[in-house]
Regions:
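A residue-level marker of the well-folded mature domains of exported/periplasmic proteins
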Residues: 1-171
């Protein structure tokens, strides 16, 4: 498996980013994780030309991406658990436990994927034998500490099972 990483340096798609994605798909890329707001428009446009796939971000973007570029283009979306976050913070406010003025890193709070502050979309197209139950088991193992995921942003992660090609900035 090969992962290519490039930074779009903006939160909207444009001709330059679409051209970059066209090149990736033409050279064998199967799925683009379009992380950056509306930048999914460039990934979706390029994917639609060749039958590629897209992973959305922030919320379940399947309706937007598939609606604009074709049914089934969206594989999943890496979601911020906005409902879980809002509910947790409003509960803290009503219980007098809200601590304003600080930055928090929110993640897993339990084994239930829908209760967590990070999730994948309900519209996820599970494939290759990986099921929603497998996803739930994976979340449970992460919450239990059996599987760890680094949140370090100061260095590229060490990887052994994949090749990572860091391509810098598009813009």
């Amino acid at each position: 498996m090969e992962i290519k990483y490039v930074y779009g340096n903006q939160f909207y798609g444009d001709a330059d980013i679409t051209a970059y994605m066209d090149t990736w798909y033409a050279n064998g890329t199967e799925i683009v994780f379009a992380c950056g707001g509306g930048i999914f428009t460039s990934a979706g446009e390029a994917a639609a030309k060749v039958g590629g796939k897209v992973i959305g971000v922030d919320v379940d973007q399947a309706a937007n991406i598939d609606g604009m570029f074709g049914e089934g283009i969206t594989v999943t979306s890496a979601m911020k658990g906005l409902a879980a976050t809002v509910n947790a913070e409003l509960t803290a406010v009503t219980e007098g436990k809200f601590e304003g003025g600080k930055v928090e890193n929110l993640g897993l709070v339990g084994e239930d994927p829908e209760a967590n502050f990070v999730q994948i979309a309900p519209s996820t197209q599970f494939a290759d034998g990986f099921t929603q139950d497998d996803y739930k088991a994976l979340v449970a193992k992460m919450f239990a500490g059996e599987i760890t995921v680094s949140n370090a942003i100061d260095a590229e992660p060490a990887v052994t099972a994949v090749a990572v090609d860091y391509q810098g900035n598009i813009k």
